[in-house]
Regions:
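Active-site micro-motifs of SAM-dependent methyltransferase domains
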Residues: 75, 107, 147
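Divalent metal-binding pocket/active-site signature
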Residues: 1-71, 89, 108-116, 132-135, ...
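Mid-to-C-terminal alpha-helical segments outside catalytic/metal-binding sites
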Residues: 21-22, 119-151
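Short acidic/histidine-rich active-site segments
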Residues: 97-113
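Short secondary-structure boundary segments
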Residues: 57, 79-81, 103-105
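Active-site glycine- and acidic-residue-rich loops that bind
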Residues: 74-87
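Active-site gating loops and adjacent loop-to-helix segments of metal-dependent hydrolytic enzymes
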Residues: 4, 97, 106, 118-123
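Short amphipathic alpha-helices and their capping/turn segments at secondary-structure boundaries
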Residues: 86-96
Length: 151
């Protein structure tokens, strides 16, 4: 749900409900792109019984983080940690058991054109922001990814 986009919310909600049904029918995790809609998206996937969901590039309300985590869902950090103070604060609030790392490529972050290799940069910036070691973040996010994606 991207409430910054020009597509009507009603249309987005209908399509989102169809995607939720598809994910549930095939027992697949959902990757959620949310802008100005985190609480609504969370409520919709939770109400529909979605088992696994990732709130990609989490930049939603910090006070929503505990609810998302309590639902068993994940929130991901991305290379925006190099410049976005709000993303840094949000990622600090995410419990380690709910954190994933990503690159969101091919996106350009200021002057950095994101590539898969930049997951290491995301790891480093997440560790720095959270005051945890690279090893702690890497071990936890790897375990989280395995749980979320069944790998």
């Amino acid at each position: 749900l991207d409430y910054k986009a020009k597509v009507k919310k009603k249309v987005q909600k209908r399509v989102f409900q169809e995607l939720i049904a598809l994910a549930n029918a095939h027992d697949k995790p959902m990757i959620l792109h949310c802008r100005y809609s985190h609480a609504r998206a969370h409520q919709m996937v939770k109400d529909a019984g979605v088992k696994q969901a990732v709130f990609h590039w989490y930049s939603g309300p910090i006070d929503l983080v505990p609810e998302i985590a309590a639902s068993g869902y994940y929130m991901s950090a991305c290379p925006a940690l190099i410049y976005n103070p709000y993303h840094i604060e949000a990622i600090r609030a995410v419990p380690l058991s709910s954190l994933l790392l990503e690159t969101d490529c091919p996106v350009t972050y200021q002057t950095l054109e994101s590539r898969p290799v930049h997951v290491r940069l995301t790891l480093e910036k997440a560790a720095e922001a959270r005051g945890e070691t690279l090893e702690e973040i890497a071990a936890a996010t790897t375990a989280n990814a395995r749980r979320c994606f069944g790998i």
